């Protein structure tokens, strides 16, 4: 079994127990890693504190970081460095779009809504990578969560699909930029999972049913399966992998 006892990872984007990022946390925790968590609002901190009771972390390392604020990202990672020292990687699972920009016609997306989705869902990875790099002097790994809607036009995904396409390009350019620093940057394209964010996508149950019927594995995946792939990408087992987008979707991406 993979041993991550001497590794420290920052996990961003846990909203509740259904979050993909929490599935990642559970797997990394089982493998012995020290985990650091960020959250946006105070109510998220309270939820995180409850979830930590399910993990084996001896200490609660929780930091409030709103990725829309450069100052909070900069100060947050600086404080993480002071408290826990260097880190080995970051799991980024942050995305947001206004509900009306997911449910309406894509051509009616507002400028404000378009930029908001890009800012939170894509640009946040850029500034996070810049600050996390300072805590990875010997190299490390950054992994982001994406979805098939960034590669193909998916009904009702709208502005978030464009944001995910941006995120996936972001991953490639960060991989190129940070490669000389021995920092790898990859993405996991996860199958639709019943998370808080998924509630905003129209026809979500139809998508789940289609995957069960048409995907090679004839089933949907869960958060822990994404977590297992994240553990691989965050660990030295994937030392030669960067700029990659690995699909954890029962093979749905491979069929027409």
From Swiss-Prot:
Disulfide bonds: none annotated. Substrate binds at residue 97. It holds the Pfam family adh_short_C2. Inhibited by 1,4-disubstituted imidazoles, 1,4-benzodiazepine, naphthyridinone derivatives, triclosan and its diphenyl ether analgues. The active site is at residues 147, 157. It is an enzyme of class 1 (oxidoreductase). GO terms for molecular function: enoyl-[acyl-carrier-protein] reductase (NADH) activity; enoyl-[acyl-carrier-protein] reductase (NADPH) activity; identical protein binding; NADP binding. Belongs to the short-chain dehydrogenases/reductases (SDR) family. FabI subfamily. Catalyzes the reduction of a carbon-carbon double bond in an enoyl moiety that is covalently linked to an acyl carrier protein (ACP). It has a preference for a long chain (C12) substrate compared to the shorter (C4) acyl group. Involved in the elongation cycle of fatty acid which are used in the lipid metabolism. This is Enoyl-[acyl-carrier-protein] reductase [NADPH] FabI.
